[in-house]
Amino acid sequence: MTITGLNNFHRKCENFILNRSYLEAFEALLSYDYSRKFSFDIYKEKSVYHMLLSYYSAGIADPGREKVLSDIALSLLRFNDMARIEDMRAEHSPMVYLSNVYSERGTDLGSFHVMLSSALSIQSADAETHQKTIFEYMASQPTFSVKDVEFANNIFHDAEIPVAAKAHFVAALFIGCHFSFDAAKLDLLLSLCEKGDVEVRGRAFASVFLLALRYSARLPLYKDLISRMRLLSDMPSFLDNLKAVAMQYFQCRDTERITRKMQDELIADLKKFAAASKNISAMDNQTLEDLLENPEWKKAAEQSGIDKKMREFGEIQSQGGDVFMATFSRLKNYPFFESLANWFLPFAPSHSVFNGANLPINSMIADIPMMCNSDKYSFALSLLSIPESQRSLVVSQMEGNFEQIKEMRQGLTDPEGDRFLDIVRTYIQDVYRFLRLFRYRSEFVDIFAIEPAIHSVPVFNCIMNEPDTVALIADFYFRREYYAEAAEMFDSLLAISESSSEIYEKSGYCYQMLKNYPRAIDMYEKALIFNSENVWTLRHAAVCYKISGDLDKALVLYRDAEALAPSNISLLLSIGHLLL
């Protein structure tokens, strides 16, 4: 079976269990070659289940039935996870291979901690290697033992371990739990959300959110984890942090559209613009901003629409949109990115991969707030491959922008809160790049491709009472033509916020696309209360009335639209067709 095939089988068994189709789950697991190692335990659970069924059939009261069923579900989920790991071992999975390597070494996390501490104390170059080893160990172990948890806590509470290294290890816990569910790792992440350095807290909070989405159907079975999540929700900053993470997650889900838009519109038009502007003067050694200040270039750019598109993408970036994926996705082929650990490594200007070169420019790259860490490494590595003269030009251009960034940073009113936002944004972008570009990405579920059922996530679903967050989610669904989900979100938004013509129009359009014409008409009519002269709304409402058989009302609305747009040929044709 291929990696994709076994992941699909694992998901099928998991769905049986979570939907409480236990007989199908038993049958599927017992027929699976790689669950034979646990077949005795599976049969034990099956006999307990049959006993419950016999009690139920006999009408015997059993107050502990739900607890027993929950325990059976947890056991079956564990066996299903273990069988998947065994199968992936047979398929030579790189993740499972890493796990085997560390198991065969016989060295525990505590020993790796000692090695890292020793290397740091003497400023040895081996510290990088030991940090990578700890990351790989944490990420590759399917489940943490009690000792693993103890050693991991020691690492995170060791004041001598740099904050950047701890932030790196947070990502390792996330990757490990994302690859194979582990309540111990998730519990560790929850504890790291509560206190400590903002870089660690930001990554931990984002990791918990992403894992809660990944395992939204599974989490309610783990009562201790739910209790920890409820404790986390008591923190004063919880709701603000949750909103920041959720909004960045949805911004990241929009990356594919932004990338396609950049490639199809901005980049394509820039190429045409450059080709058409060869004769325009003052081109040499100028930045794009300088060129656009040149009167000739400025006029040409305005006529071509490029300046408008650049402003549009600048606005997208200012709102948290990921505009760098289009460029840096092509710069992830360096050997540096063959290592799992390096995709989540906080940017270090003096990292050994640079061989001591480019330190001045790397220091500037480190302070670019809108660029995620893996893109910073891509950028810095790409600069190593260009001639020194071109590199100097890049440095001179960056110095001016760097001063602007410093001034902007000095004007922040909430440095701690803005730092949290930056960490969350860049970390989630790093996760996005990993799941889309890592060469072994097929071993992982793409969190950005699954249905984001936030409303079903325990504790975190409180965010569905926040209008700005619900509006963002609704618009995300709407733009991607997920009309059923968008309609549900718009209904939620109308229940918790002030109504507007735009919300009613979008909601009406969703219901129209779902062929729920009575509901669509209701939404359009409410939109017209706010703005009775909107031709678009009048026409769409008329179409719904026409399909519903109310031709008289459709004609009235078409006539209203005609009065506003008398020369609209399409509108006149619609009226003529209705009058036939």
Question: What do the predicted segments below correspond to?
Answer:
Residues 30, 187-190, 491, 525, ...:
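Alpha-solenoid helical repeat scaffolds
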